[in-house]
């Protein structure tokens, strides 16, 4: 008889109930819990999965390149990026009648197509790609890279090529390699591409495989580099009237420090970007030589941590500092993953911010729907990564934390004074929540009674001060860069060459948008969401080992549900339920963030900033003038007269609501409910002649509480994302194309 799924757990494989299937799926990637798993085997399996992950990413990129080259309009778009709408791919749908075919035959295509809101056209154009042939070449290259990555993953699972546990635990060597080679070397390589290919293309000089060896990226060649006269590479930048992609007004500089934006493409200067990557690359290459490995020189991370102790003789014992942390982190994959996810989460949110405020891709600032989609996309990814960071922090405390090895160090002391941390986060959340909601509701009441002048409107003076210090003149605050005679301004004037930062911050760009009372309120609403999410995540991790109500929680494992007051209130210390609740709050918060970004920009793009400024100070303004007003076009995708090209978003909007609402059925429930439900369904099936023709291999049993809630959370999250994605894209593209 064939072995039952899952092969990695004999205990589960022999389970006679449907628990076998669901727990098998749930623990498929929890390698630590698999039968016969050793620490070395665990590291080897994870190492190989990295190559599989790279292969999937490569395949995805390859597919994008291939479909745009085959079914897109890249070459037509390149000829006129401001007026041609980029095509993502063709649509073939057997349900389409003539009306739908006509509605989706757009952007100069001869058959139904989807419009691209990914920014890929802008990216490829900026980095020097101009033809479909180049896209095909890129696609084939990425496909080969994916195949190579898959082979590498397979190879490192073979006995002769499996790295040892000592190799994985060599933190200094790994850090040097990641810093110098992966970050440093790749940044310098990217500078090379920008200087040798992208910048010449932006000046109308094609560089391809046929001529890249004999086209000098700079007229002076490598002479200035070897003589130390590097300033030559910054001389003669592109002029302010340069037409992007042509020699008209082009300069010869390759590494500049101009600041601001190219006036026509409204993106950062490519020569500034090249300079940035070169500097970053050099810093990382230096950083990659800092840690002691084979030659006995450089720092030992363990020594650095052991040396970081609080001063002796300080009033109150400050503990053992960072002693024991090196081994704790180096021996815990969950701790390392938590740190990596938190770092990546912050960086992803920063990418969302920078992609719109300081766009690096030519003409993307004028593709409003793409800007909205990319901002929203990156903020949603950021919250998922941040929640994951704390989830693995909780698992670390349950599976990997050793109280003896961390006695009285900073980690142990975090656990010891967790009540202070949690209660501080709690009062901050309560303060922000009551005061922000109080202001909004007060304003709602006075507006609804016809006295809008009685609103409490608070100017964000501290934020305006920061903007003024950075050079924004409109607030009339003579401080730092807003004051021509300040030390900051004088220092800026002494930097040689032309600089355009002040033009950018005071011009019609997205750098430091003007802010007022509406921004002040929504800023504090977002702060409430962030602090509440953090409270739930931090409490979930710090209470994962146990709390006052259940000090031995760690002995019950990780899959411990919040099960009401029956056992003395286990909701207090279920890391699972803390994670679920935090995801709801994170989605809530990212909703406010993206609503704010989108509405403010809709007002700017349509030339009607007064609408945001006047309506954003009370809740009904948000519901009526942002959500309701902007969903009307979307819902009209289908109407009595047929359908238009918003129909797909209208359908997705409705379907997203359905998925979202389904989630609540799984959330408002308990285990007895699921057992009754499943037994009722089984009873009905057993009395139906067709369903009874097949044997029941597994006895159906109820979902556990933790499982039922994750099903609810999955529906809530997916529905939430689908609904807002449809709303965002349809409401923006319906207005601006």
Swiss-Prot record:
InterPro entries: PSI_PsaA/B, PSI_PsaA/B_CS, PSI_PsaA/B_sf, PSI_PsaB. It is a multi-pass membrane protein. Keywords: 4Fe-4S, Chlorophyll, Chromophore, Electron transport, Iron, Iron-sulfur, Magnesium, Membrane, Metal-binding, Oxidoreductase, Photosynthesis, Photosystem I, Thylakoid, Transmembrane, Transmembrane helix, Transport. Phylloquinone binds at residue 674. [4Fe-4S] cluster binds at residues 562, 571. Its main location: membrane. Gene3D superfamilies: Photosystem I PsaA/PsaB. The PsaA/B heterodimer binds the P700 chlorophyll special pair and subsequent electron acceptors. PSI consists of a core antenna complex that captures photons, and an electron transfer chain that converts photonic excitation into a charge separation. The cyanobacterial PSI reaction center is composed of one copy each of PsaA,B,C,D,E,F,I,J,K,L,M and X, and forms trimeric complexes. This is Photosystem I P700 chlorophyll a apoprotein A2. It comes from Parasynechococcus marenigrum (strain WH8102). The gene is psaB.
